Amino acid sequence: MIAEVPAVPAPPAPASAADVFGPARPTALAYAGILATRGVQRGLLGPREVPRLWDRHRLNCAVVAELIERRRGTLLDLGSGAGLPGLVLAMVLPDVTVTLLEPMERRCRFLTECVTELGLANVSVLRGRAEDVTLRTDVVTARAVAPLPRLAELALGVVRPGGMVLAIKGRTAAEELRAAGPVLRRIGARDAQVVRAGQGKVVPATTVVRFFAR
């Protein structure tokens, strides 16, 4: 077994973590430790990302919860990878049933270990691709999965009619949405817009492309 020693020490949680995670803060701390050790050792997180675990990866994802009005629905996280944003959202939305969809077996093993060790009873891990999934969910989330047109195609295949898709994007989100707008409308997306989550809590605020299924 590989010794769990981080390449770079995990940074302490910032004061804002208590506000963003609330009672889930201890779980968030434990997950940060897992990411800084096994996440790095297994290649799910680059060593240079460890100092930015909180601002770039954890808080950045957690604040997306404020965009999810239904607090007792279902959520599917596409291409979960190391669990961002799906695992983080499951912590702050304990009454939402979260499915982490990931095609790679080694990543699924990592996610399953995290779910078990963190005691997240509202999370299940599903190995597969969005094209092969038959379930329909209230919310779909994604981060760094695919360009927006392809992501929309995948997400609209698994979200229920009227359901919401939240794609965490970067600085070029507005330009990407403008370019993809005609495609999104053609394949059944509506009310697509760029929104900000976590304003006043994280700097910079998280940029999200949000749209709904017809």
Kindly label every feature range from the protein language model:
Residues 1-76, 91-92, 106-123:
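Class I SAM-dependent transferase core
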Residues 96-214:
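S-adenosylmethionine
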Residues 60, 85, 176-179:
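Residues at alpha-helix caps and immediate loop-helix transition turns in enzyme cores, especially N-
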Residues 42-43, 51-52, 82, 143-146:
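Flexible, active-site-adjacent loop/turn segments at secondary-structure boundaries
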Residues 78-80:
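Conserved beta-strand/loop positions that form the S-adenosyl-L-methionine
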Residues 82-95:
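Conserved SAM-binding loop of SAM-dependent methyltransferases across substrates and taxa
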Residues 32-37, 83-84, 124-125, 150-154:
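Short hydrophobic/aromatic-rich motifs at helix boundaries and adjacent loops
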